[in-house]
């Protein structure tokens, strides 16, 4: 009787150990604070994976920039310090200039998943950085220029930037400096509020949503149309970690990512409309470029970014071999007309 009881206990312990071992864990960090809408979107994705992956795979979020600095996160996932990162591709642009195809895109993840664009970006990530590009989240949202003071225009309707203390970053500096001729002040997102408060900057590029989350609307009074660019927020996974997961775990995570690409497009467009309404009600004014000035503004945003991409690609192994294909997959010239 004792032997049977012991045997049963051992069998039960083995079963429990097997079940515990079967549930794999992916550690993750995100680039922005939890209060920002984009981070909330990523955490929603995590919740979906953890629900679908019960007993198989779970994502363990370790935090945001307070855990690993936002600009150090791409190296951290490449080096295996963390398994997964949600971050703009622009934060590792020096290693992967092809991310500019997403920045200059007028398509969303839905179209580029279907046409092979994301598959190509994934392939390039694996080749250049040893990373699995899991998905392009929160696409379909573009950028505006936001200013404290009323914008000025020249006789031809072009935006005048002389005297503007414009905050810049890696996403839009090629456009701001090479076309607008602006002198930019590079600042990470977390430092912009205090810079606006102290008058260090009085204008910034930012996406159509999130201004209220960051409380920058306390200082910014004008939105300049048209919007330009696209968000390039994506999830990357250390390739060794990805390949070590079971086939079932990989399928769960990838399937949820593809669905979240679709869901986030609609969710963030609704959030954009909500934010615009709230900003307008609080007194935010909208000014717009028109005619040739508008067309030239949009063309420059696109072409200066492509120019930057091609230049940096040409300096790296593999050169510009994927350049034309990236533009073909991530930009619809007919839609731009």
Report each predicted region and the residues it spans.
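N-terminal signal peptide c-region/cleavage motif recognized by signal peptidases
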Residues: 17-19
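A gly/proline- and charged-residue-enriched helix-loop-helix capping module
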Residues: 108-128
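N-terminal secretory/targeting leader peptides
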Residues: 12, 23-111, 131-337
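Bacterial N-terminal signal peptides that target proteins for export
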Residues: 1-9
